[in-house]
């Protein structure tokens, strides 16, 4: 049983903490929070131990939230830390993890240099075995890598061109925008996603462009893949249908808009309406000779959660990729095939 700390209890952190509680081989030591907001109150209500910076102890206690200790205490009590702090903050905490000789999992908002390896479970789990510091790539990069590494099982992927329509903010991020604009992210090519993919697949020819859209629900990707050999559409659909963490969306559902997919998640009683699987629209899959085009939706709040769980096992050499992915999927109810 591995003891896991989660530093940060926001959009990703609370989902990772809940996922750890569902693993048969992990124990959640507690979570770190810096302010006593509603998320801290909910964590306390769930019985999760809360650790805070030394200077914040009084503020939490005055709010009625008992404190289990400092963030340093949390790190010392754990075998490994999943750092889900805001972009760039994880690198500031790394010296603490090093001080106590603890392994750590970082998120895609950190620079790749913060870790020994960037990670995507379906692509390079074995390369991450025993690595002390692992960086789980961002939500968009996770989706790109899952898709690319899956199609690579049909025949070698030689080139990728992708356009990413990014959500402007998570649903709780009320101070972010835009509200009525499309914003190039950036107006230069490539966007950072290509470099991020290359941090996992070193020599892949990939170019990405991105734009921010006024929505909070999901991202959308439109990708063009050039393969080494000619393929049939049925082979591409088959590998997508039979790969875990990817689901197909059929037009017969009459639910292709991201808002409709969120409603599907509600009706399926998904926790927090999460869909951690890449959602590929099956009618969008186009194949001609060695060229494949497709579009899919990405739920940015949950897609990296199973990757974090697998990264814990890879870092601590708990088990093989196949076993870890299977246990994670089963414990979190993650599907393959068609969503409905």
From Swiss-Prot:
It is an enzyme of class 1 (oxidoreductase). Pfam families: DapB_N, Gp_dh_C. It comes from the Archaea. Homotetramer. Belongs to the glyceraldehyde-3-phosphate dehydrogenase family. This is Glyceraldehyde-3-phosphate dehydrogenase. Keywords: Cytoplasm, Glycolysis, NAD, NADP, Oxidoreductase. Its EC number is 1.2.1.59. Its main location: cytoplasm. The gene is gap. It comes from Saccharolobus islandicus (strain M.16.27) (Sulfolobus islandicus). One of its GO terms (biological process) is glycolytic process.
């Amino acid at each position: 049983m591995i003891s896991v700390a989660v530093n940060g209890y926001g959009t990703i952190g609370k989902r990772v903490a809940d996922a750890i509680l569902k693993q048969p081989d992990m124990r959640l030591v507690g979570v770190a929070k810096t302010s006593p907001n509603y998320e801290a109150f909910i964590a306390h209500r769930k019985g999760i131990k809360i650790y805070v910076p030394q200077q914040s102890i009084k503020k939490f206690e005055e709010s009625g939230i008992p404190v289990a200790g400092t963030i340093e205490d949390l790190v010392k009590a754990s075998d490994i830390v999943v750092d889900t702090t805001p972009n760039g903050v994880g690198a500031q905490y790394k010296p603490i993890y090093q001080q106590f000789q603890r392994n750590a999992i970082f998120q895609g908002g950190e620079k790749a240099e913060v870790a020994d390896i960037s990670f995507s479970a379906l692509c390079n789990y074995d390369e991450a075995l025993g690595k002390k510091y692992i960086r789980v790539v961002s939500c968009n990069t996770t989706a790109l890598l899952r898709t690319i590494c899956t199609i690579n099982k049909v025949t070698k992927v030689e080139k990728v061109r992708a356009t990413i329509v990014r959500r402007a903010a998570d649903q709780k991020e009320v101070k972010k925008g835009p509200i009525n604009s499309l914003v190039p992210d950036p107006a230069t090519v490539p966007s950072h996603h290509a470099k991020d993919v290359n941090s996992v697949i070193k020599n892949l020819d990939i170019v990405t462009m991105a734009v921010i859209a006024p929505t909070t629900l999901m991202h959308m990707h439109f990708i063009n893949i050039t393969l080494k050999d000619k393929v049939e559409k049925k082979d591409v659909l088959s590998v997508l249908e039979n790969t875990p963490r990817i689901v197909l969306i059929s037009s017969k559902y009459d639910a292709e808009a991201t808002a409709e997919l969120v409603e599907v998640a509600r009706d399926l009683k998904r926790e927090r309406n999460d869909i951690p699987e890449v959602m590929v629209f099956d009618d969008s899959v186009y194949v001609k000779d060695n060229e494949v085009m497709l579009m899919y939706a990405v739920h940015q709040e949950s897609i990296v959660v199973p990757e974090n769980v697998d990264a814990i096992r890879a870092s601590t050499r708990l088990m093989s990729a196949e076993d870890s992915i299977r246990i994670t999927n089963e414990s979190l109810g993650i599907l393959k095939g068609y969503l409905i």
